[in-house]
Amino acid sequence: MWIDKQKTINLQLEMPVRLSTYRKGNAIPPLPGTNIFHSTELFHVFEMTRGYEPLLIVAYIGNRPVGKLLAVIRKSVRLFPPAIIKRCEIYGTGEYFDEEQNKEDLFGEILEHLTNEVLCKSFLIEFRNLENPLFGYKAFRKKQLFRH
């Protein structure tokens, strides 16, 4: 098992992860995957919905997509203060395509990128419907997104 981890680390060092953020549906290239919560189709639905601003973060190694995460910045308008709140919502922890890569490390890279992209626009970042609550624990702790 240790050899596999070392091999994964070496692969990541040889081939750096490139992260791309897509904000317009017509700019998104064809991507693999079957998870509806991180699909291009849901991106288009959010894009056409008033008050929703979707962004799709795709991780590439070379020109090959290895993971993706769909987030949406949702604007809530209320009668009482604070009247307008923007929050970033993500369903699940993304979708990953390369079994050779450590998914939690890849998620950590995507989470770092997501945080830098949305914190200036939204009040909070909320992850919902986590399939495995322990997945990404290290990345969430590192970003201080929750504490004991």
Placement of each model-derived feature along the sequence:
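N-acyltransferase acceptor-side catalytic subdomain
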Residues: M1-H148
